[in-house]
Amino acid sequence: MLIPLSMKNCFRLLCQHKVPAAGFKSPPTHGLILQSISNDVYENLAFEDWIHDHIHLEGKPILFLWRNSPSVVIGRHQNPWQECNLHLMRQEGIKLARRKSGGGAVYHDMGNINLTFFTTKTKYDRMENLKLIVRALNAVQPQLDVQPTKKFDLLLDGQFKISGTASKIGRTAAYHHCTLLCSTNRTALSSSLKSPYCGIKSNATPSIPSAVKNLLERDSTLTCEVLMSAVAAEYAAHHQVDGHVNLINPADETMFPGINRKVKELQSWEWVYGRTPKFTVDTTFHVPYEQAHLEIQVFMDVKNGRIETCAIKAPDHWLPLEIGEKLNSSFIGSKFCPVETTLLTNVLLRTCPGDHHLHSKWYILCEKIRGIM
């Protein structure tokens, strides 16, 4: 049963003293089940961290249920250029987010359920949570063959991944979050999580591709609503908490003081891209020239999402040496992103007005460079 939250007392009991009073109408004594009314990935990720930072979880575990509009969420230590097809995502309006926990890249949409289990650090147990999900699935469909793995995934029929795991462990609090594939767009999932970019070298955490399947493909009655209700019921029974699913708005600043600041941080270029571990780009591409093609070499060091060193080498007869050197020096310090490259290109073109032949080469070159961003 879903009930809307009226939060004026409960968080007063759950929150640490540094947080202004805000909370639920009926204070829980053992724990809570929450469900977000937002489909915004940044708001939901921010709410996770708000709970982690502000709620006293001793004896009061929390289950948070949430879904997002199409988005890709990468782990804290990942490289988005290695993990995603950023060009496709920009075209399709698929958001990119970097979470505070580790692990690999995942695709979210309204057919993918996200489950976050909040506990104290001492009560943190990923396998227990996964077994709880398995019991919930078997309660609605006893014929399902779903098993947890040593890597804390859930496999359907011993081969199809339906859930992946990540976690964050703090000084006293911890959370384990995982996905549950119900009716996600598997075409969008596959294409979004397939990087087309070549020549990137990095020590960032790589994702491990897996064969996936939707639970709805196995049984048409296993809708997101059915699965969320089943997990909530099993969680309530296991933890002996109130089975009501409390609806919350994670963007409500009056209810969750400081949440908007967390949302803005997660949306920022500095967090999403700037937190990428240092990497290099070492690649070549070809440009048309008379009846043939010329090879252009590109080498860049990228740190904190910005170009630290740049060496673009083109044949002198195609691009004059001094122009190439100007391009290299102009890139240093700029963001490794297509928007900034476009702005930089326009600025540089104004330094040599009227040279249409050079302009066309410059456009071709910068378009190729944007293609690796």
UniProtKB/Swiss-Prot annotation:
Subcellular location: Mitochondrion
GO molecular function: lipoyltransferase activity; N-acyltransferase activity
This protein's pathway: Protein modification; protein lipoylation via exogenous pathway; protein N(6)-(lipoyl)lysine from lipoate: step 2/2
Pfam families according to UniProt: LplA-B_cat
One annotated GO biological process: protein modification process
Family statement: Belongs to the LplA family.
Annotated PANTHER family: LIPOATE-PROTEIN LIGASE, LIPOYLTRANSFERASE 1, MITOCHONDRIAL
UniProt name for this protein: Lipoyl amidotransferase LIPT1, mitochondrial
Gene field: Lipt1
